[in-house]
């Protein structure tokens, strides 16, 4: 006959309080049917175990609910974008994302541009755009305390002009943009930059046609004051789409710029959106084009650089960093391969300049390149001796 396990004597009870999990395990092994409640700490074991189980179950329940919420959100977003194309339009323009947030665009000197004038133009009724005119650095002393009239008059002096068209998000006062203005100004260029309607302190609702018209208005304003001085157009990121739209229109009316510079360009907005890092989690989602790309096209947004370059008749320079995480390098290279053999560019120089990924210039830091000055001198001509 099996011997019944003896109860733990009270005087030895303290030795049984070693880790509770081990005690419970030993008791389970020694217990005989019918002895439930015989051990003094059985209720403690059951209580602790239930609490531990409850905590684990509660954690798993919350995690499961969170995962279900994420899955529901993941599935719902494509339908929201399809039903409300304005969401996708905002993702393209990002004009409401303004950074730096606390700068006064009326005071470019706060950004270190003490030879810059701020003013406003009105391309259309109910549309106003904020503009900065930065004169060549050699004129910075003369520019101190001068008014808009002086800045307009100095455009006719013997210095070339660059019209800069920025990308989405931010304003004309964005740091990487300001740093580029300084580089170009130090090389002897006037730099005209502005915020499209709906960006910064400019008034109006953004659209591709509206942005292009704003750029055309500023270009005509420059040409009316710059005399025979060269006028170049520089577009960056989304601004390359505005730039090719503008230059195509200028070429069609036979008033092309002296050169076009595209920094970090894409082929067209559909290919760019499909390659954008934001699209990674949906790129293989069934019906991706229908959900995400068709609403962009339906909103009248194309920015068809690949088509526009076939109708451009002026020298073309493309700059692109291999480590660009926003607009993949291969899109800039593809655009060059389309432009180089184009009939309209047959008599003009078309150049593609890559920047190695080890340099770390990514999407918006090509201005840091020590070679940029020489690249521009070789392509546009030297201005620093003037």
From Swiss-Prot:
The keyword Nucleotidyltransferase does not apply. Belongs to the serine esterase family. This is Lysophosphatidylserine lipase ABHD12. Its EC number is 3.1.-.-, 3.1.1.23. Keywords: Endoplasmic reticulum, Glycoprotein, Hydrolase, Lipid metabolism, Membrane, Transmembrane, Transmembrane helix. InterPro entries: AB_hydrolase_1 (IPR000073), AB_hydrolase_fold (IPR029058). Pfam families: Abhydrolase_1. Glycans are attached at residue 114. PANTHER family: ALPHA/BETA HYDROLASE DOMAIN-CONTAINING PROTEIN (PTHR12277), LYSOPHOSPHATIDYLSERINE LIPASE ABHD12 (PTHR12277:SF61). GO terms for cellular component: endoplasmic reticulum membrane; membrane. Residues 88-386 are extracellular. The chain crosses the membrane at residues 67-87. It catalyses: 1-(9Z-octadecenoyl)-sn-glycero-3-phospho-L-serine + H2O = sn-glycero-3-phospho-L-serine + (9Z)-octadecenoate + H(+); 1-(9Z-octadecenoyl)-sn-glycero-3-phospho-(1'-sn-glycerol) + H2O = sn-glycero-3-phospho-(1'-sn-glycerol) + (9Z)-octadecenoate + H(+); 1-(9Z-octadecenoyl)-sn-glycero-3-phospho-(1D-myo-inositol) + H2O = sn-glycero-3-phospho-1D-myo-inositol + (9Z)-octadecenoate + H(+); 1-(9Z-octadecenoyl)-sn-glycero-3-phosphoethanolamine + H2O = sn-glycero-3-phosphoethanolamine + (9Z)-octadecenoate + H(+). GO terms for molecular function: lysophospholipase activity; monoacylglycerol lipase activity; phospholipase activity. One of its GO terms (biological process) is phosphatidylserine catabolic process. The active site is at 237 (nucleophile), 324 (charge relay system), 363 (charge relay system). Lysophosphatidylserine (LPS) lipase that mediates the hydrolysis of lysophosphatidylserine, a class of signaling lipids that regulates immunological and neurological processes. Represents a major lysophosphatidylserine lipase in the brain, thereby playing a key role in the central nervous system. Also able to hydrolyze oxidized phosphatidylserine; oxidized phosphatidylserine is produced in response to severe inflammatory stress and constitutes a proapoptotic 'eat me' signal. It is found in: Endoplasmic reticulum membrane. It is a single-pass membrane protein. Residues 1-66 are cytoplasmic. Gene3D superfamilies: alpha/beta hydrolase. The keyword RNA-binding does not apply.
């Amino acid at each position: 006959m099996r011997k019944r396990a003896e109860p733990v004597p009270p005087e030895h009870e303290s030795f049984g309080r070693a880790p509770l999990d081990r005690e419970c395990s030993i008791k389970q092994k020694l217990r005989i049917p019918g002895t439930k409640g015989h051990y003094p700490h059985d209720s403690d074991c059951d209580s602790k175990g239930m609490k531990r189980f409850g905590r684990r179950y509660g954690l798993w329940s919350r995690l499961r609910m969170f995962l279900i919420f994420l899955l529901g959100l993941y599935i719902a977003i494509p339908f929201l974008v399809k039903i409300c194309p304005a969401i996708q339009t905002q993702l393209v323009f990002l004009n409401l994302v303004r950074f730096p947030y606390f700068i006064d665009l009326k005071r470019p000197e706060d950004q270190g541009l003490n030879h810059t004038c701020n003013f406003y133009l009105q391309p259309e009724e109910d549309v106003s755009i904020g503009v900065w005119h930065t004169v060549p650095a050699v004129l910075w002393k003369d520019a101190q305390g001068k008014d808009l009239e002086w800045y307009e008059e100095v455009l006719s002096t013997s210095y070339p002009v660059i019209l800069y068209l920025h990308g989405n998000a931010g304003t004309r006062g964005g740091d990487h943009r300001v740093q580029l203005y300084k580089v170009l100004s130090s090389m002897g260029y006037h730099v005209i930059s502005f915020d499209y309607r709906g960006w910064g302190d400019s008034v109006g609702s953004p659209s591709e046609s509206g942005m292009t018209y704003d750029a055309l208005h500023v270009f005509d304003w420059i040409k009316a004051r710059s005399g025979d001085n060269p006028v170049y157009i520089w577009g960056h990121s989304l601004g390359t789409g505005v730039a090719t739209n503008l230059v195509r229109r200028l070429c069609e009316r036979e008033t092309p710029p002296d050169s076009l510079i595209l920094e970090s360009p894409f082929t067209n907005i559909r290919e760019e959106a499909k390659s954008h890092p934001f699209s990674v989690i949906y790129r293989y989602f069934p019906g991706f084009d229908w959900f995400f790309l068709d609403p962009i096209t339906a909103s009248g947004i194309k920015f068809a650089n690949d088509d526009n370059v076939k109708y451009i008749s002026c020298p073309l320079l493309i700059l692109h960093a291999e480590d660009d995480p926003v607009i993949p390098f291969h899109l800039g290279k593809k655009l060059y391969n389309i432009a180089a053999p184009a009939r309209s560019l047959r008599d003009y120089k078309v150049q593609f300049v890559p920047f190695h990924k080890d340099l770390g210039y990514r999407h918006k830091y090509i201005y840091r390149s020590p070679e940029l000055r020489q690249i521009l001198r070789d392509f546009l001509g030297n201005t620093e001796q003037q």
